[in-house]
Amino acid sequence: MAPPFPVTYSTLSAEALAAWLEASYELGAVTACRLLHRGLNDSYLVEAARGRHVLRVYRAGWRTADEIAYEVAALEHLGRKGVAVALPVRQPGGDVVDWLPAPEGSRAAVLFTHAPGRELDGSSEESRRYGRAVASIHAATDDFETGHRRFALDLDHLLTRPLAAIRPFLRHRPADLDAIERLADIVRRGVAALPAGELDRGFCHGDFHGDNAHIEGDTVTMFDFDCCGPGWRAYDIAVFRWRWGEDEAGEARWAAFLEGYRSERPIGEADLAAVPLFVVARAIWLRGLHAANTADWGRSWLNDAYWDRLLKGLREWQAKHLGGEPESVSGAASAALPEGPPAAAREAIVADAPATRRPKL
């Protein structure tokens, strides 16, 4: 019999995972285990006698053991500080990360508590509460230390590597690729020109767009720290700015977010000045993430309309906030949005949220 054909990204049986969870954790009877979505990782909603949880099964090779241990250490640090986050659950023997043998290789699995409540509604009041929660995480991790190594959210991570993934998709549009490269250089020079000692640095969530949280009463509970790492806090703040755009509702959310953040923690002038730069970095990083993961998500949706949308947004943002504009957008900058990745991945990729909630760039 021929050996099994190689696999790059399998879907683990929810029924088998339920049995494994019941045997491995002190959850009592596991009554349901359902796949929530596939994205950067696979997330399963777990219903058990001792409560609701979320199981994250990492893609093979997506994170190293040390990188996962860093995330776990940060979450447990936040838990000790009393910050509302979805916490990792340890097995009776003390292990928090398990490795499951999948056809494509070992896949890490971590069980988390479920964040209570519902998704935020995007109102000014809830954006204000969200800003307070972001500030509380930054404040609580000022003294976070760990021996585990994690990638930094630096310009190599946010620009250099994403651009390397983007280039093959824009070879037929060299003027547009050059425009993005030039804008990335503006970001690099702009960040370098800011007084380094005045930029707040430390632990960052890396994905504070507003959807990785639930609210119950006055409490906002954060989850999904898979993009976390040491970096500029201005980038963390800029992700929210990028997410909601500049229409009237977006501006109201941004103002409320800043008000909430400042009620818990100050924001320096250098950090505010860096936000427009990091909005561009976020837009480029996300497109690089999409381009780098076509083996699992497909590539047909990375079409000209997709790149038109990015160039149009970058051109408008640069003209308004950074001066000048990218020199070329091949063809008409389409107002139509690309179809986006497969529906199963959409909850993990914010750019493909419903049209009313998509970021502009």
Predicted ranges, named:
Residues 1-26:
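Juxta-kinase regulatory segment immediately upstream of eukaryotic protein kinase catalytic domains
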Residues 3-5, 168-169, 286-361:
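ATP/Mg2+ or Mg2+-diphosphate-binding catalytic cores
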Residues 27-32:
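Conserved N-terminal boundary motif of the eukaryotic protein kinase catalytic domain
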Residues 37-50, 54-55, 88, 188-235, ...:
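Active-site acidic catalytic loop and adjacent metal/ATP-binding pocket
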Residues 48-146:
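ATP-binding pocket architecture of kinase catalytic cores
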Residues 233-266, 280-298:
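Active-site activation/catalytic loop segments of kinase-like enzymes and analogous catalytic loops
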Residues 267-279:
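All-alpha amphipathic helical-bundle segments outside canonical DNA-binding/catalytic cores
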